[in-house]
Each structure stands twice: as structure tokens, then as C-alpha cells.
Amino acid sequence: FCNDELYQIRKHRLFKYFGFWSEFHAKTIDIPCAYFIQDLLNNVPESQRFLSFKSDIRVKKYKRYNQELLESNQTHIRDLMYYLGELHNCNTYDKENNYPIPQEIKNIYGAEQIDELNNILSICSTFEEFLQHNQILYDYFEKISS
């Protein structure tokens, strides 16, 4: 997954217009690649790669992002997308644990709004899927901003 193809996506002529997509996917591209490269440089055996990544998720990232959202009173839709990207990342690379959206956060930002956004982003998990389904996402933004 950490190869030239992902970096070519960022150079795609349409990419600059999809800032919301990039907020969600920054985690799923940049962070795992950074850990992967770090493991390669440190000659970590393949069977042990991502162990430090999983450890960081459990100890830091999930709790930190939950806390930041709970403490924020000026959260924008981009922040929610970045947060959902973080959860998506946690659940992709650490299948032994389930990282749910806490009810407390759903209560603050609206369970229906967060669930709907999460469902939309789930069907837009690649750039190609996003291009196919971007109207659903734009309709969602229009709905919540009106």
C-alpha cells in the first residue's frame, strides 16, 4: 500500500478539488506509510511490522482524538472527517480491538450526522470510489450546511 501509486493520487489533476476527501484519507495514506518506512529502515521483520503503530493507536491516537473532539467547541466538518479517518485507520490496522465512535461524541455532534458521514466515507474509501460517489458526499455537505 505504501508505493508510488498513492503519491500519484495526490498529483492527480482532480485531487486539489477534493479537500474533504483528503482530510479523511490523510491518515490512511500518510501515517501507515510513515510507520512502514520506519520499520523498513529499522529492518523490522515482516511479521512484526506495524506493532509500534498498533501500540501508538491504543495508547495515544484514539484517546487523544476523542479528547480533542470532546474539548472543542468549534469543530468543523473537516475535523470530523479527519477524526473518522483516524478511527478508520485504527480499525484497519488493529483488527483485535474495536475503536467505536463514543456515544458522548455522538451526543455532542449528532449521532445521525456522524453515522451518515461515516457510512458515506465507507463507500468512498479509495479515490476511484470517491469519484464515483462524490455527489452523495456533496449532497450531504449541502444538507448539513443549510
Residue ranges and their predicted role:
Residues 47-146:
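Pan-zinc metallopeptidase signature
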Residues 2-79:
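Metalloprotease/metallohydrolase-associated module, dominated by Zn2+-dependent proteases
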